Every structure is written in structure tokens, then in C-alpha cells.
Amino acid sequence: SRGLGDVYKRQAQTIDIVPTLAEFFQIAPPEYMDGHSLTPVIRNDTPIRDYALFGIFGGHICITDGRYVYMRSCKDPENQPLYEYTAMPCHMDRPFSREEMSEAELCDKNAFNFMKKSGVFKVPVHHSTDSYRFGTMLFDLLTDPEQKCPIHDSNIEDHLCQAMKKMMKDNQAPKEQFERIGLTE
């Protein structure tokens, strides 16, 4: 039986937390919600997803199947095109500058389903995390759980790259994200 402090080794994403809480409190999640309840994992270790997509804004876009972690970097040092999409033009600690807003454009209201036809700004970003200097990396969590020694396996990389493209499409990643990391949509 599972208890406090147990570790679950199934793929999950942050977006799975709200559906889990909604199920616990017997609230129907909105139809546009992409996450999955973690209840099957918690109750009987049943997987809810084959892959987890993650990353950092403007940095690596990553995917894992639980065994391997594939970290795709930007294709060139300029790390472009890169845009911030926001309904609230603020950074964590300050509002966007006049210069930033002068380059902003209002997106098509149908650009993202989850915005429910609300407008969002598309703001060019000219500085970000430098994933290029690290390059694209592949790790085997079975032999290298601390991800210290990247491996090279084109078959695994191709497989995870295809899964990454599918998940990016499913999550409505803007088309320029594919271009930024050198993938065709």
C-alpha cells in the first residue's frame, strides 16, 4: 500500500494538479482543460500520460518518457523568433516598458482556445535564457539519474522529437516556437 513519502514514477505535469483537485472536490473541470487527474496514479500506479512536456521560457523545450529526457535548444545564438504572449503586460517585478509595448501587437482572438476569444498581446523578446551554449541534450535517467552525461542516440532522439512536436501542437505552441528550436511544424 502507498503512504506518506512514497515516490511515484509516472509522468505528470503541473496542468494535472487542477483536474486532480477538481475530481477530489467533485467539481467538473472546464472542457478546455488539458490536464489529467492524478487519481489513477495515486490509487494504483496507472499511467495517465506517455510523455511530459516541460521547459523554461526562451530556453530548452524538454520532453520525457520517464526513461529519457530530451532537451531541445534554440537553433542559433539569437534565439529568435521569441515572443511573450500575455493578457497582462507585466514582468514578475515590473510592468512592460514603453519600448516593449511599442513592439507589441494584439493577437487574433482565436489564436489560443484556452483564452476563450480574449485578446492577448504578442510582445517580441530580445533577451532570454541562453540554451544555445548548452546545445540539445539527451539523457538516460536509468543510467544517469542526475543528468550529468548526455548520450547520443539518433533513434531515441528522433522518437522523442516526434512526440515533442505532437505535444507542442496539442498544447497550441505558437508556430515560431517550432522555428526557434529548428523543428518543422
Question: What feature does the model see in each segment?
Answer:
Residues 49-53, 154, 178, 182:
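WW-domain-binding short linear motifs
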Residues 9-65:
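Polar, surface-exposed loop/tail segments
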Residues 159-184:
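Charge-dense polyanion-binding interfaces
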Residues 57-152:
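C-terminal, low-complexity/hydrophilic appendages and adjacent surface loops
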Residues 18-22, 26, 39, 71, ...:
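Non-transmembrane alpha-helical segments in soluble domains
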Residues 1-8:
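Short, small-residue-biased leader/transition segments that mark boundaries at the very start
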Residues 12-19, 36, 133-136, 145, ...:
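A structural signal for well-ordered alpha-helical segments within the folded catalytic domains
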